[in-house]
UniProtKB/Swiss-Prot annotation:
One of its GO terms (biological process) is negative regulation of phosphate metabolic process. Keywords: Cytoplasm, Phosphate transport, Transport. Homodimer. PANTHER family: PHOSPHATE-SPECIFIC TRANSPORT SYSTEM ACCESSORY PROTEIN PHOU. This is Phosphate-specific transport system accessory protein PhoU homolog. It holds the Pfam family PhoU. It comes from the Bacteria.
Amino acid sequence: MKKASEIGHTVKAFDEDLGGLRALICEMGGLTEIALTSTLEALIHSNKELAAQIVEKDKEIDALEIEAERVAMRIISLRAPLADDLRDVIAAMKISGILERMADYAKNIAKRVPILQNMVSIHPVPVLPVMGEMVSEMVRNVLDAYAARDPKKALHVAEYDMEVDGLYNNLFRILLTYMMEDSGRISTCIHLMFIAKNLERIGDHATNIAEMVYFAATGKQMPERTRGKDLLASEGS
């Protein structure tokens, strides 16, 4: 039988491992949030130097995902966590993958910044920065929900998803109208459509993180929510 001191040491070591994993996820989330806000700044101000920095720094987020997965697997194999602790580890592992994909979407937007500089300009589309700000707020809030392990905050983030879908569909219609009115705008509008789609997907992934936070905190699946219609998918079907 283990002595009380040995049990205490094991519990402390486990808590340190779990804390280290959560710290990795928070660091990864912070870098992903910076990537998104910097991408929006680069896009709005046509800053190709900033866009290039975003593309380069994506490697750091990729490396953190690999490290988070390694730490999570080590905890599972050595500590055999149960109940709440197991949910925390599984959630962290899944969230790290989601954050990496979100950062990839931000990187994809950044790659289009120098391309758009050399294309036919169009009238400002006010919906795009509004959509970007809403998605940024979703990401910021869901990271706060994860740090606080707060299921109510997670639910609030998920409620934004349909609003983002609505903005995306609104922007889709605006850009479609531009293309119909002037064929010279088609290439620019297509790039903007892909940017909007990437933002919409980041919003979806923020909601996926909210679902994992809710699950880790409560042990239950987040209640079903209404999803907006994807006009781009509808056009292709």
